[in-house]
Amino acid sequence: MALLLVAGCSGGSQGTSAGGSDASATVGAHMAGPAAEVHVTPEAVASIPNPWALSTPESAVRSYLDWTSYAYRIATSDVATPTMGPDEGVRVDSYIQYNIEKHQLIDQTLDSITFGAPSVGSTSTLIPTKEQWTYSYLSIEVGNKVLGGPYSASYDSTYTVVKTKKGDWVVDSVKAEALGTVK
């Protein structure tokens, strides 16, 4: 069984339906671009991260990274939007669409993260990190054949985290500097 996603221009709502051996969902309510069938394995769909923890700036960054990685893996940005502000949501959604247009998904794993001292401002908190990642590019076709990787990447990043009206912390923006080559 695999999840089939149809991505592209869509003004409709998301939904799922079971039919035969595939489940299907229409994604792309926020995306623009040519329609594409995206197949996602049941294992990828089942790899749901822990629930969002948005009570502190650091926990918000961790949740953002977990849920954004999951969104990239299943080509569905909406699952991660509660961890981020609207502008960051557009950026994540655009990156998913970019990968779909290249007929690929990205499967990434955060291997390690070290948090630096936060800089607390009047409206936001800056959280510096050092991150180690492993990632692969997978085909959007049935079976999700590995197209490239696994690769490793290291980043020095700074997360701007803001508090919402509900009192949750969310990632408003990310500045990431690759330390070495990223493929």
Indicate where each model-derived feature is located.
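Juxtamembrane and targeting peptides
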Residues: M1-S59
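Glycine-centered loop/turn positions within well-structured domains
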Residues: A7, D78, G167
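Exposed beta-sheet edge and beta->alpha loop/turn motif
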Residues: S13-S17, S21, S122-K183
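Core segments of small alpha/beta cavity-forming domains
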Residues: P34-Q108
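Short coil-to-beta-strand transition motifs
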Residues: L105-L110, Y151-S154
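Short amphipathic beta-strand and strand-loop transition segments with alternating hydrophobic
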Residues: S112-S122
